[in-house]
Curated annotation (Swiss-Prot):
Residues 390-393 are annotated as: G4. The gene is infB. GTP binds at residues 290-297, 336-340, 390-393. Coiled coil: none annotated. It comes from Listeria welshimeri serovar 6b (strain ATCC 35897 / DSM 20650 / CCUG 15529 / CIP 8149 / NCTC 11857 / SLCC 5334 / V8). Keywords: Cytoplasm, GTP-binding, Initiation factor, Nucleotide-binding, Protein biosynthesis. Residues 66-81 have a biased composition (Polar residues). This is Translation initiation factor IF-2. The lineage of its organism: Bacteria, Bacillati, Bacillota, Bacilli, Bacillales. One of the essential components for the initiation of protein synthesis. Protects formylmethionyl-tRNA from spontaneous hydrolysis and promotes its binding to the 30S ribosomal subunits. Also involved in the hydrolysis of GTP during the formation of the 70S ribosomal complex. One of its GO terms (molecular function) is GTPase activity.
Length: 780
């Protein structure tokens, strides 16, 4: 029989191997370590010693158990005829433990039914050898993996013989099966937020994440609300508000600000509330407008000379297109060329670069077309107007007539009860200039023009050029803040750092305040007139914004729409870019203008109308070209010619100018261009016939028809029909046309040729090959 090792015995009795070794030494049995084996005699002695100790420890507990149950009987023990059977633990009832530790452990186990073991009966009737064998088997049954009833989930019946391993496995499986698994509690959904913030749009998944809900739940709600959406589909503002309203959650849309948009900084300046104590009075910015030869340039020259006589010695060369004039310790800023592109571009963008407009009207000429145009420009910009009645020194001057004519355009003099200031002057002789300057200062005081000099500068570009020695040079007008040397700046689509600044006197300055013109260098490229500039905190930010704006401008330039002309009008209409044709009419007399306009308005082709945006009498000037470029219009001139400046501007702006001397030709040209929108009509034309006289089959080529041209001619690029007994059997194109072995472009009547037809080899002798072309016919 096998022997038991020390550690196995210790494990069965739930004691340490050290205590077992000490107990064996007390019995006089020497063991080396926990791996040593214990023979049967030593094992019997050790069991007797352990039983004696356990009985002393269990005696009080057993009495307590008997008293509690009201039973005076002792513990239930099987009848033993042999003293050696007292140490046989499996012969006791399965529910009773042999040691306190085991008893405590078995108390939590499920109670089992006590059954007599067949092995015990066999052991009682057997000899000493069988009893010893039973003792050994029972000891093995208490080892780990056996069917010991003292272990949780174990089998209460004693094991039989050598089947204890299988019993142990079954017992463990039963323990696992009997163990009840509690399902995990599903997590509680988070509480809905009080408010969510979004910008532009959200997908269903993003909205579900913000609401702490599953996307499937939102998809169901959206479907019930009439919105069909998938998990990755973007929801607009209405759908987001709809679903959040259903949940009772507030919605707030966050508007993202494009930091590369310079207009945002100007809007913030207008909207932000500034401490009045930080604002200081700034000089007014004045521009001069009027009709040709009414004295605008003379007035500017006179004002320059006045500046020289007032404070400067000698003649001063003007370096930039704007200058300042000081009178009564107050400054006035004048734009040198009020009609140039900078003013037009700024007015179109709504930029309030100028504060006051001086309208120059000749006293001997009165109100002219450009005068009316200047009035409309000033009103569109919302600027106050001061009327300077010039040339009062001439004998035929009549200022009252000028006042009377201007009342028709809501410019009523103060002397007549209106609110428009009229200042009679003589720019040539310098009369009335000081009074005009005083009126400008008076209007500026009424307007309360103020700015904050303690902020970073913003403003607009008056003009710019590329200087050979200094590189890109830009003339800026500071509208608010203070511009310093070294400031990182973004000007339109360019950027840089201000290296040098030169004022209108040609002197270098270190800083300039509001309403001051200055010429700067240090940009990476030449900006456009009318661009805005903004000073930033650091050069890195300015560079990033400038490069982003430049790249966007390049993309926009590549995808820009070409100007409309009569030649490409149909392409624009077909692409859906236009639904009407904008036209500017200029003629020699008003009657021709009205007749031409009335005739053009009657043209209606496929729902596309002619829209006349401007009519006037006189030559085509630069203002007409500017308007045509802004509105994508075509300029029609009747008995008039464009000026040299207008022709140059038209070339630069790609504006189409059409000149006519006969009115119906102008009408026909516009109508013909509009009819180009209709699909062209084609008509078939038979150009020749050929009779097939012989066919030759060639591998990799197909069937070659040897033909004789009986009528007209056969061309290489014509379409053909194969006619057999008067029936068309195939229609296609010629693949090859040869005369002898050479390729031919065409074969005339009376000549022989070889023809192969694309995708057709079933050519028979006596077939007729008919050649035709499609010709476009003119619409009527």
């Amino acid at each position: 029989m096998s022997k038991v090792r020390v550690y196995e015995y210790a494990k069965e009795h739930q004691v340490s191997s050290k205590k077992v070794i000490e107990a064996l030494k007390d019995l006089g049995i020497e063991v080396a370590n926990h791996m040593s084996t214990i023979n049967e005699n030593a094992l019997r002695q050790l069991d007797n010693a352990v039983d004696g100790t356990n009985k002393k420890a269990e005696a009080p507990k057993k009495e307590t158990t008997s008293n509690e149950n009201g039973n005076s009987k002792g513990p239930n023990k099987p009848n033993m005829t042999n003293s050696n059977e007292k140490s046989n633990k499996p012969n006791k009832p399965a529910g009773q433990a042999t040691k306190p530790a085991t008893a405590n452990k078995s108390q939590g186990a499920k109670p089992a039914t006590n059954k007599p073991a067949n092995t015990s009966n066999q052991t009682q009737s057997s000899g000493n050898q069988q009893q010893a064998g039973g003792q050994k088997r029972n000891n093995n049954s208490n080892r780990p993996g056996g069917g010991n009833s003292n272990r949780p989930g174990g089998n209460n019946r004693p094991n039989r013989g050598g089947n204890f391993n299988n019993k142990g496995r079954n017992t463990k499986k039963k323990g696992k099966l009997n163990h009840s698994t509690v399902p995990p509690t599903p997590p509680k959904p988070k509480e809905l937020p009080e408010k969510i913030v979004f910008s532009e749009s959200l997908t269903v998944a993003e909205l579900a994440k913000k609401l702490y809900r599953e996307p499937s739940e939102l998809i169901k709600k959206l479907f019930m609300l009439g919105v069909v959406a998938t998990i990755n589909q973007s929801l607009d503002k209405d759908a987001i508000e709809l679903i959040c309203d259903d949940y009772g959650v507030q919605v707030e849309e966050e508007i993202k600000v494009d930091v590369t948009d310079l207009d945002v900084y100007f809007e913030n300046e207008l909207n932000e509330t500034v401490d009045e104590s930080k604002l200081v009075e700034r000089p007014p910015v004045v521009t001069i407008m009027g009709h040709v030869d009414h004295g605008k340039t003379t007035l500017l020259d006179s004002l320059r000379n006045t500046k020289v006589t007032l404070g400067e010695a000698g003649g001063i060369t003007q370096h930039i297109g704007a200058y300042q004039l000081e009178i009564h310790d107050k400054k006035i800023t004048f734009l040198d060329t009020p009609g140039h592109a900078a003013f037009t571009a700024m007015r179109a963008r709504g930029a309030q670069i100028t504060d006051i407009t001086i309208l120059v009207v000749a006293a001997d000429d009165g109100v002219m077309p450009q005068t009316i145009e200047a009035i409309n420009h000033a009103k569109a910009a919302g600027m106050p107007i001061i009327v300077a009645v010039n040339k009062i020194d001439k004998p035929q001057a009549n200022p009252d007539r000028v006042m009377q004519e201007l009342t028709e355009y809501e410019l009523v003099p103060e002397a007549w009860g209106g609110d428009t200031i009229f200042a009679p002057i003589s720019a040539k002789f310098g009369e009335g200039l000081e009074n005009l300057l005083d009126m400008i200062l008076l209007v500026s005081e009424v307007e309360e023009l103020k700015a904050n000099p303690n902020r970073r500068a913003i403003g607009s570009v008056i003009e710019a050029e590329l200087d050979k020695g200094r590189g890109p040079v830009a003339t800026l007008l500071v509208q608010d803040g203070t511009l310093n040397i070294g400031d990182p700046i973004v000007v339109g689509n360019t950027f840089g750092r201000v290296r040098a600044m030169v004022n209108d006197l040609g002197r270098r300055v270190k800083k300039v305040g509001p309403s001051t013109p200055v010429e700067i260098t240090g940009l990476n490229d030449v900006p456009q007139a009318g661009d805005r500039f903004v000073v930033f905190e650091d050069e890195k930010t300015a560079r990033n914004i400038g490069e982003t704006r430049a790249s966007r401008a390049l993309v926009a330039q590549r995808s820009a729409t070409n100007r409309v002309s009569l030649d490409n009008l149909f392409e624009h209409m077909k692409a859906g870019e236009m639904k009407e044709v904008n036209v500017i009419i200029k003629a020699d007399v008003q009657g021709s203008v009205e007749a031409l306009a009335a005739s053009l308005r009657k043209i209606d082709v496929e729902g596309v109308n002619v829209k006349i945006i401007h009519t006037a009498v006189g030559a085509i000037n630069e203002s007409d070209i500017t308007l045509a470029a802004a509105s994508n219009a075509i300029v029609i001139g009747f008995n008039v010619r464009p000026t040299a400046q207008a022709r140059e501007a038209a070339e630069n702006e790609s504006v189409d100018i059409r000149l006519h001397r006969v009115i119906y030709k102008a009408i026909d040209e516009i109508e013909a261009a509009m009819k180009g929108m209709l699909d062209p009509e084609f008509q078939e034309k038979i150009i020749g016939q050929a009779q097939v006289r012989q066919t030759i089959n060639v591998s990799k080529v197909g069937t070659i028809a040897g033909c004789y041209v009986t009528d007209g001619k056969i061309t290489r690029d014509s379409g053909v029909r194969i006619i057999r007994d008067g029936i068309v059997v195939f229609e296609g194109e010629i693949a090859t046309l040869k005369r002898f072995k050479d390729d031919a472009k065409e074969v005339a009547k009376g000549y022989e040729c070889g023809i192969t037809v694309q995708n057709f080899n079933d050519i028979k002798e006596d077939d007729v090959i008919e050649a035709y072309v499609m010709e476009e016919i003119e619409r009527k």
